[in-house]
Amino acid sequence: MITPSSSQSLGMKVQMESEQSPKLQEELDRSPSSVDGSAIRNGTDMQTESPAEATSSPVEVAEDPGANLFPPPLPQPRICMWKYLDIHSMHRLEKAATVEKMREVLAELLELGFPEQSLRDAIILDLFSHALIFCRQQGFSPEQTSAACAMLQDLHKACVATPLGNVEECYRYFTSVLFCHGIRRPPFSIDLFKEEQLLALADYVVNTYFRHFKLYKYVFTPQVRLDLSLTYTGLQPLTLWPEEKENEEMMVVEQVATPQEEEPETVTEPEQQPSEVCILQTYIKSQLSKELRQLQQLVEERLKESEERLSSKLAALEQPFQTPPSKGKTKTK
């Protein structure tokens, strides 16, 4: 039998559980991101520390792009307002009256050395200067312009982080960063842009950066070279003699006084014992010659048929044209 006091205690417990459930849900929602973030940080630390322990010079590690065959994980999408261009930088850019002045201020803010001498710095300067011009044309506020430039810079960093192809991952990352600035859900996202502004910014980035995605990756990432090696089953591995060994053998033969009759024997000994490679080469040559003969015979037959058709048509054209006899007789006066 349930007493009023027990029912009240049950009600209190249910109320406490209902109040704790959203908190637990929020903690569960946050826990994967925190675990992922810690895993990403640990992964990056391992990647940066293990080459330093393996080699003494870090320059050699940086020049080896094929050490890791998998692209690095992309960062978590976050709010990036005032991330690279703060409010003072935006005021300096707004005061620039001409495009040349704006490019000078932008090169100073982005810490670009000499864009006239470095092609990469010139490309970065063109990328962000055109982005600023687009933001001015759309009437973006300083906060929106700073966030748009930060999103573009984070996208560029994700692109050049690996020489491997990751255009789909970068596009998903860019769209998730856009949503962080279009939906009001603090502290994860804010409604900084309107829907029309988000669509315009997305179209601009797709038509400019993603259209030339491979060009940016080609310029800003090191070239990866893959060497292909083939192994044939059933064949013994070839033993290649270097030229130094051949020269040493020739010197030994010259030093040792041997009759000249033995020299041709030493030269002809390898020819008397054909290797499996020679047998394979002769077989390939015989098959190729056989196929070539069949192809030549087929071409000759086709040419002969075409000549016969042409000769029959010419013979039909050379025959005199015979007019049919008239039915009516001509009348004589």
Swiss-Prot record:
InterPro entries: CLAMP. The modification Phosphoserine is found at S34. GO terms for cellular component: acrosomal vesicle; axoneme; cytoplasm; radial spoke; sperm principal piece. Its main location: other. GO terms for biological process: gene expression; single fertilization; sperm flagellum assembly. Residues 1-70, 309-333 are annotated as: Disordered. It is found in: Cell projection, Cilium, Flagellum; Cytoplasmic vesicle, Secretory vesicle, Acrosome; Cytoplasm. The keyword Cytoplasm applies. It comes from the Eukaryota. This is Cilia- and flagella-associated protein 119.
